[in-house]
Amino acid sequence: MEDLTHAGGVVLRSDRGDPQVLLVRARRPPHDWVLPKGRIEAGETPEQTARREVQEEAGVDAEVVRYLGRIDFERDGREIRAAYFEMRFVQEIEAAEDREIRWATPGEAIALVRFEDTGRLIRQILVDHS
């Protein structure tokens, strides 16, 4: 995982026994629903970055459960290589960013996210937990 530039999380919580997935509004137009993620800072592990980004973007403290996969894409002429982790909701905290958040059922989350790779990560968790 040494060539990664970003890391993020698929945060799960239970609502009366039903799983919910955390989504945040992207800062850039068209302001899609996305999984929280951000740049890996010097000295951070990808797991630490995922946890920090979930805290900053969504105001959620979550524990890393396991590595899910990697999504590579290009944005503004730069190559982004992002690791994603399954994460378990711990508690709500104060967010560092003013972002809209949404807890969605896995089916809703898959329908709301724009990119197929993101939906694939959410589906993977569903299959693994069934």
Q: Which stretches of residues belong to each language-model region?
A:
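NUDIX/MutT-family hydrolases
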Residues: E86, E94-L126
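Short helix-loop capping/hinge motifs at secondary-structure junctions, enriched
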Residues: R16-D18, Q91-E94
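Conserved Nudix-box catalytic region and its N-terminal flanking loop in Nudix hydrolases
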Residues: D18-E56, V60
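Conserved N-terminal beta-strand and adjoining loop/helix that marks the start
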Residues: M1-V21
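Active-site segment of metal-dependent pyrophosphate-handling enzymes
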Residues: Q55, G59-E92
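A generic structural motif
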Residues: L12-S14, R25-R27, E74
